[in-house]
Design a protein with these regions (language model features):
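Pocket-lining segment of extracytoplasmic ligand-binding domains
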Residues: 3-89
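Residue-level "edge-of-site" marker
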Residues: 15, 102, 118, 142-143
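Short secondary-structure capping/turn micro-motifs that flank functional sites
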Residues: 18-19, 95, 105, 145-146
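A generic structural signal for short, solvent-exposed coil/turn residues
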Residues: 21, 42, 102, 138-140
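Short alpha-helix boundary/capping motifs
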Residues: 29-30, 113-118, 157-158
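Secondary-structure end/capping motifs
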Residues: 57-136
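Conserved C-terminal helix/tail region of periplasmic/extracytoplasmic solute-binding proteins
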Residues: 123, 127-166
Length: 166
């Protein structure tokens, strides 16, 4: 759409901005949302989250722990093995070509956040949305039960993983 008009403005996340630029070399990035966020906030800009029903998390703490462990490893692999991740992105249809992902991945800012760090980041993000329009977050900010901040079994599993990595 933006490419159809010379005066158009678009806000696109990675990898879509890179895909658009590879199709139209005249497109340019005039600001980086992460950099702009960092100028006004001391938290990480949140653009994606994993959601789980509370009941399921309580009934399946080992499944949640295993998922989060795999997720953390996946984030690490995505940042360290750009070629492999790019090929996987093409294979599963995230992007049309691995070349797009290969160029975009270093700009994607893929991170793993959990516990209080995650809660701080998401709370700040939701506060910005709420301040702009309370309806954007359902009219009120969520309470502490909204955040999954690792029950004791998960803390033990995560500590064991961190210790084994040393």
């Amino acid at each position: 759409m933006a490419a159809a008009r010379k005066d158009a403005i678009a806000v696109l996340p990675q990898p879509y901005v890179t895909a658009a630029q590879m199709k139209d070399s005249g497109l340019r990035v005039v600001l980086d949302l992460t950099r702009e966020w960092n100028k006004v906030c001391d938290t990480q800009l949140i653009t994606g989250v994993t959601v789980v029903r509370t009941e399921y998390a309580k009934q399946n703490p080992n499944v949640i722990a295993a998922f989060l462990t795999d997720y953390q490893k996946s984030v690490k692999a995505a940042n360290e093995d750009i070629d492999g991740t790019a090929a996987l992105c093409e294979e599963v249809g995230v992007v049309a070509k691995a070349a797009i992902a290969k160029k975009a991945l270093p700009k994607c800012n893929i991170v793993y956040r959990n516990g209080q760090e995650m809660k701080k980041d998401i709370s700040a993000y939701l506060q910005v949305l709420y301040d702009a329009s309370p309806a954007a977050v359902g009219g009120k900010l969520p309470d502490d039960n909204f955040y999954y901040t690792e029950p004791s079994v998960l803390r033990k599993v995560m500590a064991a993983i961190r210790n084994s990595a040393k």
